[in-house]
From Swiss-Prot:
Keywords: Cell membrane, Membrane, Transmembrane, Transmembrane helix, Transport. The chain crosses the membrane at residues 25-45, 65-85, 98-118, 123-143, 154-174, 178-198, 214-234, 240-260, 280-300, 313-333, 345-365, 373-393, 417-437, 479-499. One of its GO terms (cellular component) is plasma membrane. It is a multi-pass membrane protein. It comes from Saccharopolyspora erythraea (strain ATCC 11635 / DSM 40517 / JCM 4748 / NBRC 13426 / NCIMB 8594 / NRRL 2338). This is Uncharacterized MFS-type transporter SACE_5813. Belongs to the major facilitator superfamily.
Length: 508
């Protein structure tokens, strides 16, 4: 650390009070740049999934692991990372996370096998875990309560732009270069985000924060990794297979031990008392459920567009634009709507619209056109965008200021675990249903994914089998989207039953 940096950190920061930090909107720009790095990486990967599957001859389970290794590790470390940022400084931890993310992105681009890629994705999850809690904690600190919905809406809108930009960029890189380009493109984004964070974001910390609990971090991460792996492995190995049962047992023991440690700790990583607040518990549950619903959407549709409809990666990437556009518009309206119709009404309405979008996507057939897909994704994006600012404000507004790092980390954890289980559970449903709808007589190795079946059919010049495989995937996709619809409606029901109506900005 240079003398100038040390002097800047030691200099008293302006108090936020009711007016907020005087540079809060510039700070938000820097935080959104960091968010952009993380979201683009996740969305860019979905478009490359079919190409990665062909390159490494990967099964559906291995492709799920490529996505989930990042999400599960990130989710498992978020709470510890939040505690670390509270103790060591939120800006410092964010900078470290961006550096780790950039280095491991380069390592992923050089992957010689699918398991190397899975390992690098897990390491990227470490970097993302260091970045995410700090962003929301800093936003809560520099923005007064009445401006937070606007700030969260801008934050959500940037994520939505990345949601549209990522697949389009990824498709171009895959078509013009290779899947490795989707990881190398992270490097310039990381450099820009680092410059903005170092230059604009003030340092902040909680003087009373304790050291991160390493044993508890290991327990919760191990438990979640084991549980998600067990769910992913069920379609290929069976629910009663020894490895699946062993992973499930490891998950139960690890997570139970984690819970016991937290209840006995004088300064726990997770304050379970937060969940006694209906606002925090209700909003967090709703956020997790909508993440389950939406987590596998692009994973599934990318394969549908490229392997069933025969589109290029660029065209598949363009299909995500309505999702992003809907989310941007929804976020803009959702930032102002709580003051007019209330926070609960915003969440319930948004999730209901998202459920309608899944209903449209569940009706897709092998020959459905782009307008059908675009309309479904537009509804999904608008609904989640409209509900997002109210849900985030409600959850974080229930957290005391001195627990901002923990609260934002838990908020991110609920989202990441929702996405992880969405990919694992709904991806598992896709895989199981696909096998069930395939004609009898297809060898096991050829039924592990649509790409594997199409390759098998091509070797035997069987156009009939290829057509049957595409139909089977479309039917399995409909089952998956119907499950997403159910999750979105469940999120709306949780918000309706657990949250109170009202238009006041949530605050503790």
């Amino acid at each position: 650390m240079t003398g100038r940096q040390r002097e800047r950190e030691q200099r008293p920061q302006p108090q936020t009070g009711d007016q907020g930090h005087p540079r809060r909107w510039l700070i938000l720009v820097a935080l959104c740049a960091a968010l952009l790095v993380i979201v683009i990486d996740n969305t860019v990967l979905n478009v490359a999934i079919p190409e990665i599957g062909r390159t490494f001859d990967a099964s559906t389970g291995e492709l799920q692991a490529v996505l989930d290794s990042y999400v599960v590790v990130c989710g498992g470390l978020l709470v510890a990372a939040g505690a670390l940022s509270d103790r060591c400084g939120r800006r410092r931890v964010m900078v470290a996370g961006l550096v780790v993310f950039g280095l491991t992105s380069a390592g992923a681009a050089l992957a010689p096998s699918v398991w190397w890629l899975i390992g690098m994705r897990a390491a990227m999850g470490v970097g993302a875990a260091l970045v995410m809690p700090a962003t929301l904690a800093i936003m809560v600190r520099v923005f007064p309560p009445h401006e937070r919905p606007k700030a969260f809406a801008a934050w959500t809108a940037v994520g939505s732009v990345a949601l549209g930009l990522g697949p389009l960029l990824g498709g171009a890189l895959v078509d013009l270069w290779s899947w490795a380009g989707i990881f190398l493109v992270n490097l310039p984004f990381v450099a820009v985000a680092l410059a903005g964070v170092v230059r604009l974001v003030p340092e902040s910390r909680d003087p009373a924060a304790g050291a991160p609990d390493l044993p508890s971090t290991v327990l919760v991460t191990t438990g979640m990794v084991a549980l998600v792996w067990a769910v992913i492995a069920v379609p290929e190995r069976g629910a009663l297979a020894t490895p699946v049962l062993a992973a499930t047992a490891l998950a139960v023991v690890s997570l139970a031990w984690f819970g016991v440690r937290q209840r006995r700790a004088s300064a726990p990583m997770v304050d379970f008392g937060l969940y006694r607040d209906r606002r925090f518990a209700g909003a967090s549950s709703a956020i997790a459920l909508i993440a389950v619903a939406t987590g596998s959407t692009l994973f599934v549709l990318s394969q549908y567009l490229q392997l069933v409809r025969g589109h290029s990666a660029v065209v598949a990437g363009m299909a995500a634009l309505p999702l992003a556009a809907g989310s941007v518009v929804g976020s803009a309206l959702g930032a102002r709507a709580p003051a007019r119709i209330g926070y609960r009404a915003c969440i319930v309405t948004g999730f209901a619209v998202t459920a309608a979008g899944f209903g449209v996507l569940a009706a897709l057939g092998p020959d459905s056109g782009q307008p059908h897909i675009a309309f479904g994704l537009l509804l999904c994006g608008f609904g989640t965008g409209f509900a997002g600012p109210a849900a985030t404000s409600t959850a974080l507004g229930a957290v005391p200021a001195d627990r901002a790092g923990m609260g934002s980390a838990l908020n991110d954890t609920h989202q990441q675990l929702g996405i992880a289980f969405g990919v694992a559970v709904l991806g598992g449903l896709l895989s199981t249903a696909y096998r069930a709808f395939l004609p009898t007589g297809v060898p096991h190795d050829a039924s592990t994914s649509l790409a594997a079946t199409l390759s098998f059919a091509d070797e035997r010049t069987s156009a009939a089998l290829a057509d049957a495989a595409r139909l089977a995937f479309t039917q399995a996709q409909s089952a998956t989207m119907t499950a997403g619809l159910a999750c979105a409606l469940a999120g709306a029901a949780v918000a309706m039953l657990s949250l109170r109506s009202g238009r006041r900005a949530p605050s503790r």
